[in-house]
From Swiss-Prot:
It comes from Verminephrobacter eiseniae (strain EF01-2). Part of the 50S ribosomal subunit. One of its GO terms (molecular function) is structural constituent of ribosome. One of two assembly initiator proteins, it binds directly to the 5'-end of the 23S rRNA, where it nucleates assembly of the 50S subunit. Keywords: Ribonucleoprotein, Ribosomal protein, RNA-binding, rRNA-binding. This is Large ribosomal subunit protein uL24. The keyword Ribosomal protein applies. One of its GO terms (cellular component) is ribosome. Transmembrane segments: none annotated. GO terms for biological process: translation. InterPro entries: KOW, Rib_uL2_dom2, Ribosomal_uL24, Ribosomal_uL24_CS, Ribosomal_uL24_KOW, Translation_prot_SH3-like_sf. It comes from the Bacteria. Pfam families: KOW, ribosomal_L24.
Amino acid sequence: MNKIRKGDEVIVLAGRDKGKRGTVSQRKDDSYLLIEGINLVKKHAKPNPLKGTTGGIIQKTMPIHQSNVAVFNAATGKADRVGIKVQSDGTRVRVFKSSGTEIKGT
């Protein structure tokens, strides 16, 4: 079970975008995340008439490692660690380590 999932609101802990918040839009590989509005880079693209694309400078979201982000806890307004709790019926749920409350979401 992944502790950070698609749709989670996260806060960046390290790097150029430290302190910024965004929503996870996609998981790349196993430990890299694409976060909306975070880690934007400018790429120079050549025109390709076969694909119908024009050339120029485009902004692209690049993946960021999951160790550099933490799930944002709206109740405390801070980044929080995530734990896995096994319920009595055997299902596993994600909980915030600081408060023990269940993480709602996807």
